[in-house]
């Protein structure tokens, strides 16, 4: 695997982490003093989005780490 491919995997990973961070901040912003059903439902939806973004970041990390292990340790 060439450095260009590793750079791409690193970029994909870092982008996924940035989306995860944005989703965390969005969820945090929705934890407001507004205790209405609408506000709680929006907060719950943001939590689902955060969970999905976390999964994407973890998958991208695994792909990048696996590629690094293959290059560095031949497995």
Language model: regions and residue ranges:
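Short, charge/polar-rich alpha-helical segments
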Residues: 1-18, 47-49
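Basic/polar low-complexity intrinsically disordered segments
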Residues: 2-7, 52, 66-75
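Short E/K-rich amphipathic alpha-helical oligomerization segments
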Residues: 17-48
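Long amphipathic alpha-helical coiled-coil segments
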Residues: 32-41, 57-75
């Amino acid at each position: 695997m060439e450095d260009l491919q590793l750079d791409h995997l690193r970029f994909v990973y870092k982008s996924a982490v940035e989306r995860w961070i944005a989703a965390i901040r969005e969820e945090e912003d929705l934890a407001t003093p507004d205790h209405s059903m609408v506000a709680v439902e929006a907060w719950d939806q943001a939590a689902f989005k955060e969970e999905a973004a976390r999964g994407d970041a973890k998958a991208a990390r695994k792909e990048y780490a696996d590629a690094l292990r293959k290059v560095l340790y031949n497995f």
